[in-house]
Design a protein with these regions (language model features):
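Conserved GNAT acetyl-CoA-binding A-motif
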Residues: 41, 46-58
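Terminal substrate-recognition subdomain of acyl/acetyltransferases
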Residues: 86-96
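Conserved acetyl-CoA pyrophosphate-binding loop and the N-cap/start of the following alpha-helix
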Residues: 31, 35-43
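Conserved active-site alpha-helix within GNAT-family acetyltransferase domains
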Residues: 38-39, 57-86
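A short, internal acetyl-CoA/4′-phosphopantetheine-binding micro-motif in the GNAT/acyltransferase core
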Residues: 22-32, 54-55
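Conserved GNAT-family N-acetyltransferase fold
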Residues: 3, 15, 20, 25
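Conserved beta-hairpin
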Residues: 1-13
Length: 96
């Protein structure tokens, strides 16, 4: 599934989901810091659990996901790139 944030006929951001896994979240560079990422994350928080992978060095993204209630569950080396990455998860407060 893909959720798109569009305004004035212009796609400004989108989030791609594979069941409860966030495959990607992108906000156009000129539209960052305007709450678009928050709105997209809020849309998929209907799910009980969400997970994603993010590079450890992408400190802006890590901080964004932490602010949205995600926590680091695991740290690993990504096989193809050799980069350190985090598995981050979000649990709905209403579930165990």
């Amino acid at each position: 599934e893909v959720y798109v944030f569009e305004e004035g006929g212009e796609v400004q951001g989108f989030i791609g989901m594979d069941a409860e896994y966030i495959a990607g979240l992108f906000v156009a560079e000129g539209h960052r810091g305007q709450g678009i990422g928050h709105q997209l994350i809020s849309e998929v928080k209907r799910k009980k659990r969400l997970s994603l992978h993010v590079y450890e060095k992408n400190t802006g993204a890590v901080a964004f996901y932490r602010a949205e209630g995600f926590r680091v569950e695991n740290s690993m080396t990504e096989k193809e790139t050799g980069e350190q990455e985090y598995l981050m998860v979000f649990h709905d407060g209403n579930c165990d």
